[in-house]
Amino acid sequence: MSAALNDLLADLTRRMDGAIESLRRDLSGLRSGRASPNLLEPVRVEAYGSEVPLSQVGSIAVPEARMLTVSVWDRTVVGAVERAIRDSGLGLNPSTDGQTVRVPIPALTEERRNELARAASRYAENGKISVRGVRRDGMEQTKALEKKSEISQDDMKTWTDAIQKLTDQYIKKVDDIFADKEREIKQV
């Protein structure tokens, strides 16, 4: 393989890794039956005159499988933290215990599990679309090089095969990540 092909594949790999990371971030926001600090990541608290991420006003811990605790550093914002979690749309009902906000994670209903699985499926499909978009860019670059006679038709075939192989690997990664998340969501 030529250095130019290696450079192109390295660039495409970097961009496809970005699509995978984006998918993982999106899926981490979906609530499964287990407690996870990532669950509270999107929560923003009205504190100190502006909205700040929950992680900037306290530390999040998982003392039990179905319980999160937020140890708030400044007692003046404990009420705001509790309110922000309650109003977050995550279906959580926190309670305050001194400077600690306890957040029990309720069991998911079958209907809610199915909704979350559909949302995970949409995220996975968006991940595949991103990977395919990167592949399309790589194919266009390859065709442009062939058109300018910088690579031969044989080289173009080698390059497109390498790009397709890389794409297939990343599509499989997306499918595997989705399958794991779906299994986690469906687990009672």
UniProtKB/Swiss-Prot annotation:
Entries under SUPFAM superfamilies matching the protein: Ribosome recycling factor, RRF
MF terms in GO: ribosomal large subunit binding
GO CC terms of this entry: cytosol
Principal location listed in the UniProt entry: cytoplasm
UniProt record similarity statement: Belongs to the RRF family.
Function: Responsible for the release of ribosomes from messenger RNA at the termination of protein biosynthesis. May increase the efficiency of translation by recycling ribosomes from one round of translation to another.
Protein name: Ribosome-recycling factor
Species: Gluconobacter oxydans (strain 621H)
